Regions:
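Single conserved hydrophobic/aromatic residue that forms the stacking wall/gate
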Residues: 2-8
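N-terminal winged-helix
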Residues: 9-31, 35-40, 44-48, 117, ...
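Short loop/turn segments at beta->alpha junctions
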Residues: 42, 96, 137-138, 156
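Beta-alpha-beta core module
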Residues: 66-73, 77-78, 92-93, 140-190
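Flexible hinge/capping segments at coil-to-helix
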Residues: 69-105
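Secondary-structure junction motif
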Residues: 104-125, 193-201, 208-218
Length: 222
């Protein structure tokens, strides 16, 4: 029998569509009695829901201001630029922050840690989401815009791993040190279901490439 059983569902709120398919099917196969609900939320909403006990755990990028919550490291994920063939940056082998400006970028709306980290890394004091980008609203949509010949967006390492050969031709690395985020499992410090957390951490770490489990010398956490 499974070592984890619960009469109530465990809510794991996460914001990474590229991570869930990697570990969730295997988790359910190994622990069929485990009841987990997964919902997408913005980082600040995750923090509030954890503090109120509305949810059990969240998978987020580690950020300042989370000291009152328990952070369990999962892996490190590098950012890449996704550049349209018609953009001047397409001919660059690597992208430097000085090459970027807010007008050519497709960015998520404010409140997404993915956007906030990259704006900080690129030192864009006045970067803002395009109104069109805001209404379209997802990383996948921005990627389709780039593929159709418009602008630049940013994608995480797990997304790059799923791209086809033609799409990978649009991927560019950043100059060293490459911007990278630490992904953590966030819980309330009073959460007592330690076995559940151990299982989640184990399965998530098994689902990503081993080289993502530690920070490389060429990477810098943003």
């Amino acid at each position: 029998s499974t070592p984890i059983k619960s009469s109530a569902a465990s809510d794991v709120y996460k914001r990474q569509p590229y991570l869930l398919p990697r570990f969730f099917p295997q988790l359910m196969k190994k622990y069929p009695d485990l009841d987990i609900r997964v919902v997408e939320m913005k980082t600040n909403d995750i923090k509030k829901a954890l503090q109120t006990g509305e949810i059990d755990a969240g998978i987020v990028a580690s950020l300042a201001g989370m000291e009152e919550l328990q952070q369990t490291p999962l892996f490190y994920e590098q950012f890449f630029a996704y550049v349209s063939r018609e953009d001047a940056l397409f001919n660059n082998e690597v992208i430097r922050t000085s090459d970027l400006n807010g007008e050519q970028l497709w960015l998520l709306d404010e409140g997404h840690c993915f956007r906030d980290q990259l704006v900080r890394f690129c030192q864009m004091k006045s970067a803002r989401a395009s109104q069109l980008a805001y209404h379209l609203g997802s990383m996948e949509t921005f990627m389709r815009m780039v593929e159709s010949g418009k602008g630049v967006t940013f994608i995480p390492e797990l997304a790059v791993l799923q791209l086809g050969d033609a799409q990978k031709e649009l991927v560019r690395s950043f100059a060293i040190p490459c911007p990278t985020r630490q992904v953590v499992l966030l819980t309330n410090k009073n959460f007592i279901r330690h076995t559940l957390l151990e299982v989640l951490v184990k399965e998530i770490k098994l689902s990503v490439p081993k080289e993502m489990l530690s920070l490389k010398a060429t990477q810098a956490v943003v």
